[in-house]
Amino acid sequence: VPDPAIYICNPDDELMRPPDHESWFILVNAPRQTDPNGPDNQPGTLDWHTPGLAQDYADRVLDRMAARGLDVRDRLLWRVVRTPADLEAETGAPGGAIYGTSSNGQRAAFLRPANRSGIPGLYLVGGSSHPGGGLPLVGMSAEIVSDLVGDA
């Protein structure tokens, strides 16, 4: 993504930073992780395991921030770069998609996971489950699960 939107969170939590320092969380949109078992050269995907790719992308994000007047590069004590490949490995989200499965296409709404899972007592709620993302739909998802739990 050549010019990504950059979300910055600056929590004031002494447990997250050394004294007299700041802690920052920076989030940018990034292409999904390529399925190593899928077809090559899928549009909009990258192999985030490629050596140097993640660090180079993180450097570009810091460069974009500097170009926009927020240069923090010389103030970094350390950084942790997490990629879509990391998110996929840690959460099982396909391609490391932070917003769940794709919402594009006529059938997408019907392909989201149901609110009641196959495991007794485990319910799914939020933007990645039925009926989908966005605050109103997440609220509806919570109401559905509340009704299901009430019936359990």
Regions found by a protein language model. Give the residues of each.
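C-terminal segments that line or cap access tunnels to active or ligand-binding sites in enzymes
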Residues: V1-P84
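A glycine-rich dinucleotide-binding beta-alpha-beta segment and adjacent secondary-structure elements
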Residues: P2-Y7, D63, A67, D71-P131
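Generic recognition of stable, solvent-exposed alpha-helical segments in well-folded globular domains
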Residues: D3, D56-R60, A93, L137-I144
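Short, glycine-/Ser/Thr-/acidic-enriched flexible segments
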Residues: P11-L15, N29-Q33, S103-Q106, S128-H130, ...
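General N-terminal targeting signals
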Residues: W24-F25, N41-T45, A89, A93-G95, ...
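Active-site-proximal substrate-binding core of FAD-dependent oxidoreductases
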Residues: R82, G150-A152
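A conserved FAD-binding loop/helix module that cradles the flavin
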Residues: R107, G127-G150
